[in-house]
Curated annotation (Swiss-Prot):
One of its GO terms (cellular component) is cytosolic large ribosomal subunit. It comes from Mycoplasmoides gallisepticum (strain R(low / passage 15 / clone 2)) (Mycoplasma gallisepticum). This protein is located at the 30S-50S ribosomal subunit interface and may play a role in the structure and function of the aminoacyl-tRNA binding site. SUPFAM superfamilies: Translation proteins SH3-like domain. PANTHER family: LARGE RIBOSOMAL SUBUNIT PROTEIN BL19M, RIBOSOMAL PROTEIN L19. InterPro entries: Ribosomal_bL19, Ribosomal_bL19_CS, Ribosomal_bL19_sf, Translation_prot_SH3-like_sf. This is Large ribosomal subunit protein bL19. NCBIfam families: rplS_bact. One of its GO terms (biological process) is translation. The keyword Ribosomal protein applies. PROSITE patterns: RIBOSOMAL_L19. Belongs to the bacterial ribosomal protein bL19 family.
Length: 122
């Protein structure tokens, strides 16, 4: 098998595993990620609501970081966009001018607010 055929097979398998319905979210948006957790006896869904700090990569390896404040402590989680065990729901569009808003880690209270993006639906 030559190299071109191997690459075609790899691309085909990757395309089969991509999610069909990924919401159009960006850095600065507020999302709710529902994580399906399989325990020994049952499966449950855990929600993680927060701000998207970064979206990175492409294809199956595309990831994003969500940050939230829980009991005064900042919590960040990395997720794969095409993970079959998560569902992403867009709650609010934010207006930022960076691809990675790491400065939000030092912010709290009113300084941690992000302007809401107004979307025209004409």
């Amino acid at each position: 098998m030559n190299k071109l055929n191997k690459q075609n097979i790899i691309n085909h398998v990757n395309n089969l595993q991509l999610k069909k319905s990924v919401p159009n979210f960006q850095v600065g948006d507020t999302v709710s990620v529902s994580i399906k957790i399989a325990d020994e006896k049952r499966t449950r869904i855990q929600k993680f609501d927060g701000l998207v700090l970064r979206r990175k990569g492409s294809g199956l390896s595309e990831t994003f970081i969500v940050r939230k404040e829980s009991s005064g402590v900042g919590v960040e989680k990395n997720f794969h966009v095409h993970n079959p065990n998560i569902e992403i729901e867009l709650k609010r569009k934010g207006k930022v001018r960076r691809a990675y808003i790491s400065y939000m880690r030092e912010r709290s209270g009113k300084s941690a607010r992000i302007k809401e993006k107004v979307v025209n639906t004409k």
